[in-house]
Amino acid sequence: MAVYNYDVVVLGSGPAGEGAAMNAVKAGRKVAVVDNRPLVGGNCTHLGTIPSKALRHSVRQIMQYNTNPLFRQIGEPRWFSFPDVLKSAEKVISKQVTSRTSYYARNRIDTFFGTASFSDEQSVEVVCLNGMVEKLVANQFVIATGSRPYRPADIDFNHPRIYDSDTILTLSHTPRRMIIYGAGVIGCEYASIFSGLGVLVDLIDNREQLLSFLDDEISDALSYHLRNNNVLIRHNEEYERVEGLENGVILHLKSGKKIKADAFLWSNGRTGNTDKLGLENIGLKANSRGQVQVDEHYRTEIGNIYAAGDVIGWPSLASAAYDQGRSAAGSIVENDSWRFVDDVPTGIYTIPEISSIGKNERELTQAKIPYEVGKAFFKSMARAQISFEPVGMLKILFHRETLEVLGVHCFGYQASEIVHIGQAIMNQKGPANSIKYFVNTTFNYPTMAEAYRVAAFDGLNRLF
């Protein structure tokens, strides 16, 4: 067994692992990264964020073609199979792997591909994919192994028609009808993707409202547009059993309902990838969801072991994971790059997309904060009209007295881009955070960004 010595060893090469490794090596530390795949990038690149967003983009282009009156003069609507659309995602994945591999090589970070488990608090044993066993000794470790779909034991995921959010990328045909169980972010995104391909989707939600953490108006808008695209949403339902057949799948619900479809997608919960890390060898325990607890510096109960990304739970976003990993390394190298990552914008890539940051109306009302609302509807924006994207709005919540921007909520075309303007203002201290910024700033025209000016005027006109 070969033994290698490092300052920092990072377990996982997804966004959190990459952020940690890059920050540590830039501070002069000798760094190694271990990943259980033969390529870097983590679940985000290979099975999660990148392929699903590439899929969404392709489906959205198909929908635009089929609904744009300009193209109706050319020919009939076109439909593509799921495998055809998936090919574009595979190209993006390949490019992302190439880019990220070059990052590690350029920064002289050693990469090991295999399964790592702790021998003690100062070392891990790596069973490499080629069968060799290596021992990595380090002063500090960062656990960034990510998460995987939670799989209930009573569902047969080996059945050829039953999928989770990882295996759905192996779907080799376009089903006529699909059941998606779990109406969280992943479930809603895939409901948009498959309905955009003409699939009849039953979306099963065990709550009363879709994505209840969102502003109520945004959540209601999402429900409307999913239904408008032939997604049947069933709220307050729980599964009793999933019956796999040769020609389909039957979902038995506790309410007594039975639903049959050609394919079944389970998207209800995720679990941290900690079960193979040998945490018992160092006295570190994961919770029932496979997640490890950390303090505000991303340090676990073991002083030299840190964790970041999905493996620590909320918010389980790739964007937050990168910053958490970078901050964990910042705590190790003490280069003033540490911060507790809590100003995370929500980006949900449904069709249309959603993004928000800060408080929503429900939270502000419960906290008895006097706020006002400013709105800009995309149907009135020149850029949205030019782009044939009339659906959506920008909503700004601000304090009635101080004019401080308290929340920004966006639904529609380029929402995940638009939100960052509001985020930048909300991060300013004192009077610099003011809704008046938007009325005193010249925006390019026509742009989606000018929705901030329209919404700001709308909100200020409500004051008296």
Curated annotation (Swiss-Prot):
Cofactor comment text: Binds 1 FAD per subunit.
Keyword Cytoplasm in annotation: yes
Listed GO CC annotations: cytosol
Location of the protein in the cell: Cytoplasm
Domain of life: Bacteria
Cofactor(s) needed for function: FAD
Function as written in the Swiss-Prot or TrEMBL entry: Conversion of NADPH, generated by peripheral catabolic pathways, to NADH, which can enter the respiratory chain for energy generation.
NCBIfam families: PRK05249.1 (NF003585)
Family to which the UniProt record says this protein belongs: Belongs to the class-I pyridine nucleotide-disulfide oxidoreductase family.
Name under which the protein is recorded: Soluble pyridine nucleotide transhydrogenase
GN (gene name): sthA
